[in-house]
Amino acid sequence: MSGLFVSFEGVDGVGKTTQVERLRAYLEAQGRTVVVTREPGGTALGKAIRQLLLHGVDGGAVDIAPRAEALLFAADRAQHVAETIRPALERGEVVITDRYLDSSLAYQAGGRELTPEEIRSLSMWATNNLLPDRTYLLDMDPALSHNRLEHAEDRMESAGSDFQSRTRQAFLDLAAAEPNRFRVIDASQSIEAVWAAIESDIKELA
């Protein structure tokens, strides 16, 4: 049985974690072996990088520069693919990741004003050109999704409404450019309605 690679994308607070777990349970009930992971932080190296990306450097008076941030995301992703994602796919397993390279494109190119070409080139090099078979973009107005957050804001979440709005639009632009890979789902619906859309689609892949 061939491996299957699925990613979930969207601004913070849209319900990705909930739907990742629903999909895991569904696929395991179908007899598939499922690996659930996330970016940043899907490996030991990634966890250390995640702390830097989300909370900054202890004692650092200056925020992480956009190019440095892009390289940190790429380092996390390169290790993630080499250590976790590609080996699981080669074993014929399903990999579900909460964020992948599209988050870099949306948050860094859309939100941080680096060019999409720069970020995509770096990400594709880091992953050795590995793209998901399916990407579910859970879409919602950031003003609504922000109210759903149940934890203290991290560095990305506190970047402001303009940043979040640019990021949302960047995600939608990515989905429009790759309609065969993306499925855009209205995340303002109920959890059950969002899951129903995912379940209907995944049956064609799994």
Swiss-Prot record:
Primary role: Phosphorylation of dTMP to form dTDP in both de novo and salvage pathways of dTTP synthesis.
Broadest EC class assigned to this enzyme: transferase
Entry's Gene Ontology molecular function annotations: ATP binding; dTMP kinase activity
Origin superkingdom: Bacteria
Entry keyword set: ATP-binding, Kinase, Nucleotide biosynthesis, Nucleotide-binding, Transferase
List of residues binding ATP: 10-17
HAMAP family for this protein: Thymidylate_kinase (MF_00165)
PANTHER family in the record: THYMIDYLATE KINASE (PTHR10344), UMP-CMP KINASE 2, MITOCHONDRIAL (PTHR10344:SF4)
Organism listed in the record: Bifidobacterium longum (strain DJO10A)
Reaction(s) this enzyme catalyzes, per UniProt: dTMP + ATP = dTDP + ADP
One Pfam family cited in the UniProt record for this chain: Thymidylate_kin
Classification via NCBIfam families: DTMP_kinase
GO cellular component: cytosol
GO biological process, one term: dTTP biosynthetic process
Protein's UniProt keywords contain ATP-binding: yes
Family classification: Belongs to the thymidylate kinase family.
CDD domains hit by this protein: TMPK
InterPro entries (alphabetical): P-loop_NTPase (IPR027417), Thymidylate_kin-like_dom (IPR039430), Thymidylate_kin_CS (IPR018095), Thymidylate_kinase (IPR018094)
E.C. no: 2.7.4.9
Protein name: Thymidylate kinase
